[in-house]
């Protein structure tokens, strides 16, 4: 095998993640094996844990801000700040990662055009962070439509209209014509 993946809804919240990663590194250290983590809350993937992962082949990793503005992250109870996001990306680049994926939602309750603009602003600022060593870095933006789920605070909220979803995506594509930024 060449890739070892840890799967869960919230891997970063697992209290024994660092010891688990140390054991996985010990077993796989001499092999060309990459360790993949699912989307991790910014701030949970700290520098000491990233140094452990760095010992084997690095792939990109994903951070899920879900919203570009702090206002909207507060609405959806996503308890991370822009500083958390920037610190995590900066640490990743300093430790040699080249590919960072950011996951955002389109059509969250109370979302405004300013919130969509904030995604573009954040991506452009993140793309200016310098990497250590050689090679170029890439910020990949994944932009998926919000779908209300049952038994959640937003279960009765309307889903974004397809025309508005497409408009938001096209806006971001126009705004993010920037070297080192990909959008899907």
Regions inferred by a protein language model and the residue ranges of each:
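Conserved SAM/AdoMet-binding glycine-rich loop
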Residues: 1-101, 105-140
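Auxiliary Fe-S-binding modules of radical SAM enzymes
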Residues: 93, 116-184
């Amino acid at each position: 095998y060449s890739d070892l993946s840890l799967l869960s809804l919230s891997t970063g919240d697992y209290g024994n993640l660092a010891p688990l990663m140390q054991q996985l590194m010990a077993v796989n250290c001499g092999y060309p094996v990459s360790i993949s983590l699912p989307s991790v809350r910014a701030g949970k993937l700290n520098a000491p844990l990233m140094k452990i992962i760095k010992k084997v082949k690095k792939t990109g990793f994903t951070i899920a801000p879900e919203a570009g503005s702090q206002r909207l992250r507060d609405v959806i109870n996503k308890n991370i700040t822009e500083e958390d996001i920037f610190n995590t990306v900066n640490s990743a680049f300093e430790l040699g990662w080249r590919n960072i994926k950011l996951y955002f939602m389109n059509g969250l309750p109370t979302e405004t055009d300013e919130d969509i603009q904030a995604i573009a602003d954040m991506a452009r600022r993140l793309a200016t962070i310098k990497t250590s060593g050689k090679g170029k870095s890439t910020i990949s933006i994944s932009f998926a439509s919000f779908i209300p789920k049952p038994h959640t605070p937003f279960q009765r909220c309307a889903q974004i209209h397809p025309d508005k979803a497409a408009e938001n995506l096209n806006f971001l594509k126009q705004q993010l014509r920037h070297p080192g930024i990909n959008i899907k």
